[in-house]
């Protein structure tokens, strides 16, 4: 699975899916996202697995999208998408929307264990999980990204305010808003997440699956899926209006300007 590590608990009931690019703060390359898709499919198809835990190796859960590490640039050269806007839209839809919707709909409970930075793409994959356990050092940064779940995660008014202010949010703030399920000391993140997963794994797997399906379908009836896919079109318009990584500078690993502003503030 490349940049993904996959393990299971001794009894096989809990699958641990780990983002394994700590040297790049688990930036999400194409290969990492493809490996994540394989890992989630493996866990979903394993009848012994009852709960899936998503976690990040190292000090940070995920710094977001890979803007140009050597491995990502090599992959873009070796496996290019079609040129132009059509290729960019296809890449964005397949890697960040279609895949994330699949992960949201995995018919088993999923938990994200978040520490350190959870920026943009990090928020996307954490949001797709059913529950989030966050360390007290976790810092989250949402935006109008490809999989725009934020209004559903936080509510419309709070979303407008936070995206306009473009400030990092700590775990306690997001627990109060209902996005984070619980906040624990950093050194207890792994054990607390496993304890929660173990408790949920005691639930009848069919009942757990039906509970998740009912809640997700309720959101879909309210327009979640349509909202996410429609918002992606707006995202693409924003990207076409002004690219954040100009052509010819793809080899320079950099942060998005919006992330730099948030870090300064």
Model-found features: residue ranges?
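Glycine- (often His-adjacent) and acidic-residue-rich active-site loop
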Residues: 24, 56-98, 118, 252
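Charged catalytic carboxylate motif
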Residues: 31-35, 95, 102, 192, ...
């Amino acid at each position: 699975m490349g940049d993904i590590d996959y393990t299971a608990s001794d009894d096989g009931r809990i699958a641990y899916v780990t983002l394994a690019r700590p040297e790049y703060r688990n930036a999400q390359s194409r290969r990492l996202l493809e490996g994540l898709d394989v890992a989630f499919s493996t866990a979903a198809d394993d009848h012994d697995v009852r709960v899936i835990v998503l976690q990040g190796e190292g000090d940070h859960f995920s710094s977001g999208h890979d803007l140009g590490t050597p491995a990502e640039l090599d992959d873009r050269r070796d496996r290019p998408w079609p040129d132009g806007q059509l290729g960019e839209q296809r890449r964005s839809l397949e890697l960040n929307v279609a895949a994330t919707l699949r992960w949201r709909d995995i018919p088993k409970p999923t938990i994200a264990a978040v520490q350190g930075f959870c920026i943009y793409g990090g928020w996307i994959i954490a949001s797709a999980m059913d529950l989030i356990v966050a360390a007290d050092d976790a810092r989250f940064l949402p935006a109008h990204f490809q999989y725009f779940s934020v209004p559903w995660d936080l509510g419309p008014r709070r979303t407008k305010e936070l995206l306009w202010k473009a400030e990092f949010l700590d775990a306690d703030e997001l627990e109060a808003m209902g996005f984070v399920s619980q906040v624990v000391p950093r050194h207890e993140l792994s054990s607390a997440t496993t304890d929660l997963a173990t408790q949920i794994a005691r639930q009848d797997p069919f009942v757990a699956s039906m509970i998740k399906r009912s809640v997700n379908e309720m959101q879909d009836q309210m327009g979640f899926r349509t909202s996410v896919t429609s918002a992606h079109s707006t995202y693409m318009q924003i990207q076409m209006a002004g690219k954040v990584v100009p052509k010819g500078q793809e080899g320079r690993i950099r942060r998005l300007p919006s992330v730099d502003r948030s870090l300064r503030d």
